């Protein structure tokens, strides 16, 4: 009986940790999608989710790790104005779709952005101020973003 109870408790703890970590992973992904593309409609949000997935596959990192890598998604940079709004973003009407994407990242089709690994606003790209994008042509455009394969 004691072994059975211990096994049950161990399994419940395992489930709780798994659920909590998945929730945390999905939350970070949903927040990233919202911060980066909430004004670009579903297509723009989907494109950002696809970029997260491409980076995850290429770098062999979890979606959360990809989102939180320094200087990869500006919304997580310490001085970015979106950083302070991350929890608030989850209250927006677009959050439902962001959560849906975050829960179903395995189903996101990365071909919609031609396997792009990077993106920026079209406006910023046209300024030529970003070194890594100089002389590069976008492989896709979604919402206000240009997507690049580096």
Residue locations for each model-derived region?
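Single-pass alpha-helical membrane anchors
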Residues: 2-18
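Low-complexity, intrinsically disordered regions enriched in charged/polar residues
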Residues: 1, 5-7, 23, 67
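Bacterial extracytoplasmic/cell-wall-associated proteins, especially those involved in peptidoglycan
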Residues: 19, 24-150
